[in-house]
Amino acid sequence: LPIHTSTQMTITNVEGARLLKEQGVERVVTAREMSLEEIQRIHDEVGVELESFIHGALCYCYSGQCLFSSIIGGRSGNRGRCAQPCRLSYEVMDEKKHPVKTGKKERDLYILSPKDLCTVSMIPELIENGVDSFKIEGRMKQPEYAAGVVSVYRKYIDYYINACLRTDEVTAKKDFKVTKEDIQHLYDFGNRSGFTDGYYKRHNGREMITLDKPSHTKGNEALWEEIKEQYVRSEKKEKINGILRLKKDCPAKLEVALNDIRTSVDGDVVQAALKQPLAEEKVAASIKKTGNTPYEFAELDIDM
C-alpha cells in the first residue's frame, strides 16, 4: 500500500521531506503554509511526489498543530475534530492589556479567521513548481460544494495540460485565463469574505484574514440546484460490455466485462420456440435493463 503523509505532519522543508522519503513515503502532502519556491525546492532536491492544497479553509496556525480547540473544549484539531475557535470574535489589546482602537466593535472583529484559499488562477504555476496532486479541502462540506468546486478546477487543469500538449508550456501559461463567470461560481459555492491565495506568494498578509464575516457563505441557489441535478442526484454508472449466448439445447450464458474484470453466469437450457420466436432486439432490450445496479451496458452482443 503506497504511503502518503498528511498535511498535519507539517512538512515545510527539504529535510523533512527527505526523511519521510527515506522511511518509504511515496507522497508528501505539504503544509498549507509553504510558498511556491519552497515546494519547488522539495521537488527538485528530494524527488518525492507532492500534494498541495489549492482550495478551501485555511488554519490560523500551522495546519492541524493548533491546540486552541483542545484546550478550551477537548476537541483536537490534529484528529480532525477542531471546534474552530478562530472563527469567533476577539478584542485586540496592547502589551498593557489596554483595548486597541480598531474602528470596529469587539463583537464584529474576527482577527483569527482566515479567508478560504482559492488558486484556480495559479494552476500553471503550481504545476510548474512541482505539485503532482491537487487537494481540495472539503471536510463536512455538502456534496454540491465538493462537486461544484472540483468541476471548475478539473476544467482548468485539463485546459492548461491540453494547451501544453498543443503548443508549449510558455505559450500555454501566457494564454491561461479563468473566466469571471467561473470565479463567481467558486464564490457561489462558498467563501469567507472573499478568497486568498494563501502563503504561495507571500509569507503573511492582512488580506488573508476575514476580519468581518467568518461564516462560510454561499449564493446562487439556481447553480446549487443545477450541480445537484448533474452530480448528486444522478448516479454515475460503470460502463460494461457483454455477450449473451443462446444456443438450442445448451444453457443460456451471459458474459460481462468491466475493464479487465470478467464474469459469466449460466441460465436455463435454451429450447426451441413453440410459436413466436424471440427477436434479437427484444432480447437485448430485456438484458440491458440493469435496474438500480451501478452498471449499464456500453455494448451487448447477442449470439443466437
Language-model segments: residues:
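N-terminal active-site wall of soluble small-molecule enzyme domains
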Residues: 1-19
